[in-house]
Curated annotation (Swiss-Prot):
<keyword id="KW-0694">RNA-binding</keyword>
<dbReference type="InterPro" id="IPR001014">
    <property type="entry name" value="Ribosomal_uL23_CS"/>
</dbReference>
<comment type="similarity">
    <text>Belongs to the universal ribosomal protein uL23 family.</text>
</comment>
<keyword id="KW-0689">Ribosomal protein</keyword>
<dbReference type="GO" id="GO:0003735">
    <property type="term" value="F:structural constituent of ribosome"/>
</dbReference>
<dbReference type="InterPro" id="IPR013025">
    <property type="entry name" value="Ribosomal_uL23-like"/>
</dbReference>
<dbReference type="InterPro" id="IPR012677">
    <property type="entry name" value="Nucleotide-bd_a/b_plait_sf"/>
</dbReference>
<dbReference type="GO" id="GO:0019843">
    <property type="term" value="F:rRNA binding"/>
</dbReference>
<dbReference type="GO" id="GO:0006412">
    <property type="term" value="P:translation"/>
</dbReference>
<dbReference type="InterPro" id="IPR012678">
    <property type="entry name" value="Ribosomal_uL23/eL15/eS24_sf"/>
</dbReference>
<dbReference type="InterPro" id="IPR019985">
    <property type="entry name" value="Ribosomal_uL23"/>
</dbReference>
<dbReference type="Pfam" id="PF00276">
    <property type="entry name" value="Ribosomal_L23"/>
</dbReference>
<comment type="function">
    <text>Binds to 23S rRNA. One of the proteins that surrounds the polypeptide exit tunnel on the outside of the ribosome.</text>
</comment>
<protein>
    <recommendedName>
        <fullName>Large ribosomal subunit protein uL23</fullName>
    </recommendedName>
</protein>
<dbReference type="GO" id="GO:0022625">
    <property type="term" value="C:cytosolic large ribosomal subunit"/>
</dbReference>
<comment type="subunit">
    <text>Part of the 50S ribosomal subunit. Contacts protein L29.</text>
</comment>
<keyword id="KW-0687">Ribonucleoprotein</keyword>
Length: 86
């Protein structure tokens, strides 16, 4: 799957911001058909980082949400700043 079609948008909520600061995790709304491997590949390619782990869930609205944990040598707050989240 094309990386630019996998990630629909970053999610900016109070919980998402606290995850960036505390756990080095980014939160995205992604395509429902995307697998964890697709999401990992897309984030690594788009932001030039290494991903440690991806957790996904489908919300009550029917959107797929992905929590992407970055490896310790990368900073989620730096990526969030590049995206304009802060």
């Amino acid at each position: 799957m094309d990386p630019y079609k996998v990630i629909i948008r970053p999610l900016v909520t109070e919980k998402a911001v606290s995850l960036i600061e505390r756990e080095n995790k980014l939160t995205f709304i992604v395509d429902r058909r995307a697998t964890k491997q697709d999401i990992k590949r897309a984030v690594e390619e788009m932001f030039n980082v290494k991903v440690a782990k991806v957790n996904t869930l489908v919300t009550m609205k029917g959107e797929k949400k992905a929590y992407v944990k970055l490896k310790p040598e990368y900073d989620a707050s730096e990526i969030a700043a590049r995206l304009g989240l802060f």
